Amino acid sequence: MRLITAILQPAALYPVQVALARHGITGMTVSECSGYGRQNGHKEVYRGAELTIDFVGKARLELLVEDAEAAPVVDVIVEAARTGQVGDGKVWSTPVDEVVRIRTGERGGAAV
């Protein structure tokens, strides 16, 4: 099993979700996060002082797939999220030793 994690522009979340659904992915976990990198932040004025806000809002998407599906799923995410602009995000795959569905006790692929 592989854990696919993607940090995306929030606006890319829906197109990625639709593309993954077309690929047969039926579930994922999404959370809000923030970070900074090459995109840099933005400036705001607070009480007359100009502040640089380094952290930019992002969406974090996580899903479990069988080993053979990892590369195709990463490709689907990249194609759906890519705009060509700085800040499009990152996607990576990490190995998962074991998965257990808490409700039933199923393990491995059956738990996903």
Model-found features: residue ranges?
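Positively charged, small/polar-rich N-terminal and surface patches that mediate targeting and assembly
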Residues: M1-V112
